[in-house]
């Protein structure tokens, strides 16, 4: 059993006793009763403190000791010791409850700082702190609150007994089963509900998406919060003078209440009190009011409450606002372990900067009494956490939680500092070197720009290669963090891309930057590398102490030990376990570190040989094109599978697989049997076998992975946007440099499919023509054998009815999917090329001119129809600071920019765009969004017009205010001088974008945060329990896993969001419908806040949530959620995504099941309309839609319209899948039976008219006429023949349901099945 399985099994079997903690609270807390807290014996004192910190009763108590009887647990035991160990040491036996006492501790300055921070959090100032410190505007917002949703309908969960009972019922007759199903699913809607459904349906089909202003408006929950005080600052009288320190004074603070009263407060070791100091006089003595009363309390919040009548009232109002604004705390909770997503479009007026004098003092009270909290040894912190014990589940949870917290704090600090590096706010360590080579060391983090500063990539692409390898290094670090190999350490790393520049942030190896220990007599400095290629490339080290610790890494990356030979007789002493470029370094902390991991996967040699040639202008930018780890892993798995199969067959032949003692022998393959040399094609004297293996993996991308991706894409969901496509490709191990090849192949495959359809249609039309001729021939030969043939046909039909009905049609939108893939691929190539151009051109542009440059570039690219030579307007107050070279970008025009983009696409993606690509292949708005997300631009939410017609409509509303200097002559006659005066003018727009439209630039952060292996193990255990039928145990494990996710990642995190989505699916499958809906709603909120309000993850979360609401029989909520998803979908993709057809059709069937035929018909017509544009009028998917629509029309009693749909469907089916296909026959049957029924109806109406006419005539002649029935009987007796279709007595006087059964062939309705390889999308 593997360690993973063992830990999972331990989790499943672990039974930890729960006890109740009865906690007596100190006198400063006005709570007469003891606090009861459920706890596990496995929890630590730190966990108990955390629980108390979250409890409403004790959240303000920050400085206390925990006592058991007279024993101070806080002083006698470490905070990380489990409660079980404490009780054992104290000699306490098995108990169900434990009595503890909390006692106040005397404050010190550090405790005062902690208390002030907690006070700010409790009163709500941390919300303002969060918004003011975010690098983006309105980061982490959601739009979920804008949707008009009712509470989730509570339903009884389906038990296994219910499912068994349902299974038994299905064994009865089909008629009974259908009746039962109809009764069970029948829902009665009120008139108001029907009106709501109709309104939402009309919105769904209207195609009118909300304006961009509405899209840029988000839930503003935190903005509704009022501050219960005006300010709380460190007083001007701080720090405490020496003569007051001995009296217990620790800090002086100044409070301004909502009543405009300013008070000076002393923070004393015994608590807080108002002193006699004023703005100009210092008097630290306690203040007494006119009644002889003093204001003093151990808790600051109690003191402020006694001083300000409005204080508690405002806090209560804020709590009410939060509860009313959202029923889900996830929408406003501040994340603990994750950077939030910043929307690409925002309304800056919604972001008001609240005054708070204490905000600028936060670094003082948040980083310790001497500022030491700000200076962190990030590497030591991270590695020390990694070395914590992890033998039990609880130890692993604690360890993972601390690792995630450490990584997040590192990312946050590194990002903020990197932005200051790019803005030029910091002094480099090497100021005399060129700007690109500057390096920085700040707060334990080393910063360098992503350039070829060391010269390592001089021959393989220079700066482009250096930039690329930095991201490959990070990808390998991320994987190593997950592998968690013992004895070897990697660096904490993140990459920050901001305003076109890349900064690599790493916690350095201890001692690597320290040159003080080097021998002064040595001519050259000692190389710190112990394993791998030296820094200058002159020597290869192979310290034997690294060999054992590197083996787990080599195994994870499937690396082959190999000798290395370079030029100038640089050789390795024996085999290297890893690549020569991966370096092993010993730190001064005696740990072994591994750095420069960009060569963890081999080169894509096939791509290099085809596309890299430095002598050509159109060469790929660099030679460091590495394969993705996912591709290598997939190649390795398939090779192992082949070997395993061969070994199994060999052992079977030898009879060695026979079971012994009921157990089958295990087949174990050596882990090093399939390995790869990642140094292949980078050295000399290489093994041909090594090169062949690398070439094989390189070919594997095009020959297998891309082919499989194209096949899957043709029949599954096409990507929504560029990020979705990127994610899909990366998961399958395909590098984005293949986007051009994918675009080409999408067109090729589309043409092949159309050709296949044309050929099939030709064959079917010939068959139809042949049958028609045979039918006519038979008609002329006579009808003697008609009855026998009809009888034979009936028998054959009955036999076919008894068989399972399977259609050979292809009902996936294959053509539309390939068109969609092609368009998204081209859009992604263009967007990424624009990002690189913005980066390269802006390298020489000063930071404060970047907004002007970016807006001008957008005008040239997207505004050519409006102004092909747009003027770039620079603020007059800035022009004087910059030279002509720095303003060179203002000479760009549309033709130049479009040509630059096309050339960049060719260089980076090996794809040649057609000359008219900007007008024929690109949707301007969607490209505008993609560029914003990739470069990190936040645009003002307003209407952006990309055509002349649209621009004329909006330009007056978007007049530009600009400041210009205007000459003004002095009025004095003696001194007539020209003076320049700065005035503000409002001028009409001549371009789509202006500089002020850019609200902010946000950094794009790539970090080394990884997915915990522990959560995967627990999830697999839960899934196994459910699969075995232990549903309750499985659900309990899933619920526990949710708690684990929240502990490790925090409640607001992308991984937590994904798990909420997964958990809702499992709940729905297990019949827990209400729970599924509630969890799915949280998934929507978290996806919006962490991945973006319009990301593909958010849209998918909304669609899933809508689906779960519909399964819970709450169709109004479901339609509202679908409406939100489709609006965002249209914004992201544009009109007509292939999968939207199925979404509309499924919604239509959903409504038709509940007799809402009018709304269902509208949705079907919308689906058919979109499908016609995407797939063509005569396509199999349109035929299937019309077939389904016909069924809905039948259900609503609209037989004539149904007949039209079935006729169209039959025509399509016979042409494309042949007249013998089940769908062709079924649709023909519908056509025949409906025609017969309609003819009978017409005959009935005609007879009734005749009868009425005769009756009227007889009445006039005073002669009694026979009734219509009598007339029919009479004519029948006389044996007269009627040319009209004869009435069928079987369908006379039948109910609508019976008529439908007759039309369907008098057989119980069967569900038509497609080919088994056609999967039905949930959409």
UniProtKB/Swiss-Prot annotation:
Sequence intervals crossing the membrane: none
Residue stretches of each TPR repeat: 103-141, 530-563, 1042-1076, 1099-1132, 1141-1174, 1183-1216
Biased composition (Basic and acidic residues): 150-186, 764-801
Domain Clu: 351-608
Entry superkingdom: Eukaryota
Disordered: annotated segments: 149-186, 764-808, 1250-1323
Record Pfam families: CLU, CLU_N, eIF3_p135, TPR_12
Gene Ontology molecular function, alphabetical: mRNA binding
Main location: cytoplasm
GO biological process per UniProt: intracellular distribution of mitochondria; mitochondrion organization
Keywords, in A-Z order: Cytoplasm, Repeat, TPR repeat
Signal sequence, renumbered to the chain: none
Entry's localization field: Cytoplasm
Compositionally biased tracts (Basic residues): 1308-1323
Cellular component annotations (GO), alphabetically ordered: cytoplasm
Keyword Repeat: yes
Family named by the database record: Belongs to the CLU family.
Protein name: Clustered mitochondria protein homolog
Source organism (scientific name): Debaryomyces hansenii (strain ATCC 36239 / CBS 767 / BCRC 21394 / JCM 1990 / NBRC 0083 / IGC 2968)
Taxonomic path: Eukaryota, Fungi, Dikarya, Ascomycota, Saccharomycotina
């Amino acid at each position: 059993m593997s360690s993973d399985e063992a830990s999972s099994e331990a989790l499943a079997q672990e039974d930890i006793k729960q006890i109740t903690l009865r906690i007596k609270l100190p006198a400063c807390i006005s709570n007469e009763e003891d606090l009861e807290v459920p706890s596990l014996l496995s929890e630590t004192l730190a966990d108990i403190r955390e629980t108390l910190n979250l409890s409403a009763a004790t959240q303000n108590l920050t400085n206390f000791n925990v006592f058991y009887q007279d024993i101070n647990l806080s002083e006698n035991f470490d905070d990380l010791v489990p409660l079980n160990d404490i009780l054992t040491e104290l000699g306490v036996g098995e108990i169900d409850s434990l009595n503890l006492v909390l006692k106040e501790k005397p404050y010190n300055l550090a405790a005062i700082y902690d208390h002030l921070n907690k006070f700010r959090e409790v009163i709500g100032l941390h919300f303002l702190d969060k918004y003011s410190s975010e690098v983006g505007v309105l980061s982490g917002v959601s739009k979920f609150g804008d949707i008009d949703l009712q509470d989730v309908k509570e339903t009884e969960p389906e038990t296994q007994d219910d499912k068994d009972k349902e299974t038994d019922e299905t064994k009865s007759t089909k008629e009974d089963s259908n009746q039962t199903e109809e009764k069970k699913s029948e829902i009665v809607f009120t008139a108001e509900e029907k009106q709501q459904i109709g309104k939402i349906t009309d919105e769904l089909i209207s195609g009118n998406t909300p304006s961009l202003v509405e899209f840029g408006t988000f839930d503003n929950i935190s903005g509704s919060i009022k501050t219960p005080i005006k300010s709380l600052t460190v007083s001007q009288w701080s720090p405490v003078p020496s003569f007051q320190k001995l009296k217990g004074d620790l800090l002086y603070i100044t409070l301004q209440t909502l009543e405009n009263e300013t008070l000076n407060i002393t923070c004393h070791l015994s608590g807080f009190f108002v002193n006699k100091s004023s703005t100009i006089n210092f008097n630290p003595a306690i203040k007494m009011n006119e009644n002889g009363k003093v204001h003093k309390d151990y808790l600051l919040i109690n003191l402020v409450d006694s001083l300000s009548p409005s204080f508690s009232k405002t806090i209560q109002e804020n709590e009410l606002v939060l509860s009313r604004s959202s029923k889900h705390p996830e929408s406003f909770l501040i994340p603990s372990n994750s950077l939030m997503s910043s929307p690409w479009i925002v309304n800056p007026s919604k972001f008001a900067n609240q005054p708070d004098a204490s905000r600028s003092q936060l670094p003082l009270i948040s980083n310790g009494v001497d500022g030491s909290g700000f200076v962190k040894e990030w590497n030591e912190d991270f590695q020390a956490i990694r070395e914590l014990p992890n033998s039990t589940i609880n130890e692993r949870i604690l360890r993972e939680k601390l690792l995630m917290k450490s990584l997040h704090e590192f990312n946050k600090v590194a990002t903020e500092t990197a932005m200051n590096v790019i803005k030029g706010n910091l002094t480099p360590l090497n100021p005399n070197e060129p700007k690109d080579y500057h390096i920085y060391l700040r707060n334990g983090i080393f910063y360098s720009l992503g350039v070829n500063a060391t010269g390592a990539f001089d021959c393989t692409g220079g700066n482009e290669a250096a930039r690329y390898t930095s991201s490959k290094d990070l990808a390998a670090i991320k994987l190593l963090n997950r592998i968690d190999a013992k004895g070897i350490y990697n660096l904490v790393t993140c990459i920050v891309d901001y305003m076109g520049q890349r900064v690599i942030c790493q916690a350095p190896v201890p001692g690597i930057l320290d040159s003080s220990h080097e021998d002064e007599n040595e001519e050259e400095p000692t190389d710190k590398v112990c394993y791998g290629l030296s820094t200058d490339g002159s020597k290869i080290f192979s310290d034997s102490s690294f060999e054992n610790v590197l083996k787990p890494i080599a195994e994870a990356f499937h690396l082959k030990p190999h000798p290395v030979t370079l030029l100038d007789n640089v050789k390795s002493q024996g085999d290297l376990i890893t690549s020569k470029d991966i370096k092993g370094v010993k730190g001064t902390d005696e740990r072994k570190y591994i750095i420069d991991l960009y060569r963890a996967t081999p080169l894509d040699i096939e791509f290099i040989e085809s596309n890299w040639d430095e002598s050509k202008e159109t060469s790929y930018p660099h030679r460091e094109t590495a394969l993705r780890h996912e591709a290598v892993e997939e190649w390795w798995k398939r090779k192992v599978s082949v070997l395993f199969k061969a070994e199994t067959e060999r052992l079977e032949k030898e009879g060695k697989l026979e079971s012994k003692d009921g157990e089958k022998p295990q087949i174990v393959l050596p882990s090093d049997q399939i390995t790869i040399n990642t140094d292949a094609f980078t050295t000399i004297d290489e093994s041909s076998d090594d090169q062949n293996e690398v070439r094989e993996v390189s070919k594997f991308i095009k020959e297998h992975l891309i082919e499989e991706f194209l096949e899957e894409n043709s029949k599954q969901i096409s990507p929504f946007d560029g990020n979705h496509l990127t994610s899909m490709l990366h998961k399958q191990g395909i590098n984005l440099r293949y986007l051009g090849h994918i675009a080409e192949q999408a067109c090729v495959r589309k043409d092949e499919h159309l050709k296949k359809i044309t050929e099939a249609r030709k064959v079917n039309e010939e068959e139809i023509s042949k049958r028609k001729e045979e039918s006519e021939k038979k008609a002329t030969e006579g009808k003697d054998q008609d009855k026998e043939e009809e009888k034979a046909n009936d028998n054959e039909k009955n036999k076919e009815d008894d068989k399972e009905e399977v259609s050979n049609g292809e009902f996936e939108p294959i053509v539309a999917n390939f068109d969609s893939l092609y368009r998204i691929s081209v859009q992604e190539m263009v967007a990424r090329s624009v990002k690189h151009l913005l980066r390269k051109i802006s390298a020489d542009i000063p930071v404060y001119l970047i907004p002007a440059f970016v807006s001008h570039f957008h005008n040239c690219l997207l505004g050519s129809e409006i102004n092909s030579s747009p003027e770039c307007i620079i603020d007059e107050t800035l022009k004087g600071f910059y030279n002509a070279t720095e303003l060179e970008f203002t000479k760009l025009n549309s033709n130049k920019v479009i040509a630059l983009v096309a050339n960049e696409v060719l260089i980076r993606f090996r794809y040649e765009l057609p000359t008219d690509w900007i007008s024929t292949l690109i949707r301007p708005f969607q490209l505008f969004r993609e560029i914003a997300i990739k470069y990190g631009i936040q645009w003002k939410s307003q209407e952006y017009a990309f055509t002349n017609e649209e621009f004329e409509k909006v330009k007056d509303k978007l007049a530009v205010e600009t400041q210009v200097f205007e000459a003004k002559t002095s009025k004095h006659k003696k001194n007539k001088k020209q003076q320049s005066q700065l005035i503000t003018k409002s001028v009409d727009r001549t371009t789509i974008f202006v500089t002020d439209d850019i609200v902010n630039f946000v950094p794009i952060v790539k970090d080394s945060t990884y997915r915990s292996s522990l959560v995967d193990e627990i999830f697999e255990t839960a899934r196994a329990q459910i699969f075995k039928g232990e549903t309750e145990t499985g659900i309990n494990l899933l619920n526990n896993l949710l708690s684990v996710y929240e502990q490790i990642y925090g409640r607001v995190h992308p991984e937590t969001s994904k798990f909420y989505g997964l958990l809702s699916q499992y709940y729905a499958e297990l019949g827990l419908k209400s729970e599924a809906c509630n969890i799915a709603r949280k998934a929507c909120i978290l996806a919006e806040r962490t991945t973006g309000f319009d990301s593909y993850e958010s849209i998918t979360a909304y669609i899933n949530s809508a689906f779960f609401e519909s399964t819970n029989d709450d169709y109004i909520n479901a339609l509202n959620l679908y409406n939100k998803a489709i609006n965002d979908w249209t914004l992201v993709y544009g009109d007509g995504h292939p999968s939207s057809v199925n979404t509309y059709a499924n919604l239509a069937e959903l409504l038709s099941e509940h007799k809402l035929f009018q709304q269902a018909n509208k949705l079907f017509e919308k689906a058919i309309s979109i499908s016609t544009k995407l797939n063509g009028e005569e396509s199999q998917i349109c035929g299937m839609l019309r077939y389904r629509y016909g069924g809905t029309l039948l259900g609503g009693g609209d037989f004539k319209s149904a007949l039209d749909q079935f006729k169209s469907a039959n025509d399509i089916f016979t042409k494309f899948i042949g007249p013998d296909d089940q769908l062709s026959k079924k649709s023909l049957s519908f056509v025949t039976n409906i025609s017969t029924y309609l003819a009978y109806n017409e005959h009935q109406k005609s007879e009734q008219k005749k009868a009425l006419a005769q009756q009227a005539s007889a009445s006039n002649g005073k002669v009694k006429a026979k009734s219509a029935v009598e007339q029919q009987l009479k004519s029948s007796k006389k044996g007269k023949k009627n040319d009209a279709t004869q009435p069928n007595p079987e369908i006379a006087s039948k109910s609508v349901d019976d008529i439908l059964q007759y039309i369907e062939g008098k057989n119980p309705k069967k569900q038509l099945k497609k080919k088994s390889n056609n999967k039905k999308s949930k959409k």
